[in-house]
Design a protein with these regions (language model features):
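FAD-site-proximal beta/loop scaffold in flavoenzymes
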Residues: 29-45, 132-212
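Rossmann-like dinucleotide-binding cores of NAD(P)H-dependent redox enzymes
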Residues: 40-41, 46-50, 56-131, 188-195, ...
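Generic recognition of long tandem-repeat/solenoid scaffolds
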Residues: 1, 121-123, 165-167
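Core beta-strand elements of the Rossmann-like FAD/NAD(P) dinucleotide-binding domain
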Residues: 2-11, 128-137, 174
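Glycine-rich nucleotide phosphate-binding loop and flanking beta-alpha elements
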Residues: 19-21, 58, 81, 145-148
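Glycine-rich dinucleotide-binding loop and its adjacent helix/turn
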Residues: 16-71, 75, 100-103, 154-170, ...
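Generic beta-strand/beta-sheet core signal
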Residues: 15, 75, 107, 140-142, ...
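Short glycine-/small-residue-rich Rossmann-like dinucleotide-binding loops
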Residues: 17-18, 126, 139, 143-144
């Protein structure tokens, strides 16, 4: 079917999710350069893998494919892997990753990817020098961005902070009757946080008591080895 339909409601909940962030020159193509979505349904098993970014998404896929036998290199622009964790946790995790055969490059940046039919040449800057390394697969794990475009939110006066909708602890956007839940509402990008937000907003709309979202109370986990 085609055409436009206009709907009216007292309350509207935005739950459009998010997508992988693409950086210029590092865009995923689904062939040799993957986003997290491609890595979930891989077209081939990597033999020599480069993972750009060492947040939860990057480390989880690095750990997974390394366990399956891929020679895995992780490049992180910050001074330690898993930079949102405590420093001692990052240090312990890095030690274990190296023992497992991973190559960890911290304070390093992938400046350019040269793509060929069966390989990708990465230009990696580290310590003021640029070196080239070859891989058959690259996973770009440099964050996610909320799907805020094409919804007319700016015209309504909804505040957008870079890549997500700004909400209060009850997921209210500041526009009467308009809520935002899940990844479009920003970090932490966790399924159980989104589920709680959905239940909470449903309770609010139904006139029931609702427990607000408290970021400091949201448990998080990076599914790697060690976990």
């Amino acid at each position: 079917e085609t055409g436009t339909e206009e709907l009216t409601a007292q309350n509207i909940v935005l739950a459009t999710g998010a997508r992988a962030r693409n950086l210029p020159g590092l865009e995923a193509d689904g062939d040799r350069v993957w986003s997290y979505r491609h890595a979930l349904v891989p077209p081939h098993m990597p033999k020599k893998l480069l993972v750009i970014g060492s947040g939860a998404i990057g480390i989880e896929f690095a750990s997974f494919y390394n366990t399956l036998g891929a020679e895995t290199t992780v490049v992180e622009v910050m001074d330690r892997v898993l930079p949102v964790e405590d420093a001692e946790i990052s240090a312990f995790a890095k030690k274990q990753f190296v023992k497992q055969g991973m190559v960890i490059m911290e304070k390093a940046t992938v400046k350019q990817l040269d793509r060929a039919k069966d390989k990708v040449t990465a230009h990696i800057e580290s310590g003021g020098k640029v070196e080239t390394r070859e891989f058959d697969t690259v996973i770009s794990a440099v964050g996610i961005v909320g799907n805020t475009e094409g919804l007319g939110l700016e015209a309504l006066g909804v505040t957008i902070d870079r890549t997500h909708v700004v909400t209060d602890e009850y997921c209210r956007t500041g526009v009467e009757g308009l809520y935002a839940i899940g990844d479009i509402a920003g970090a932490p990008w966790l399924a159980h946080k989104a589920s709680h937000e959905g239940v909470m907003v449903a309770d609010l709309i139904a006139g029931k008591h609702a427990h607000p979202v408290k970021p400091e109370s949201i448990a998080g986990c990076t599914y790697c080895h060690p976990q």
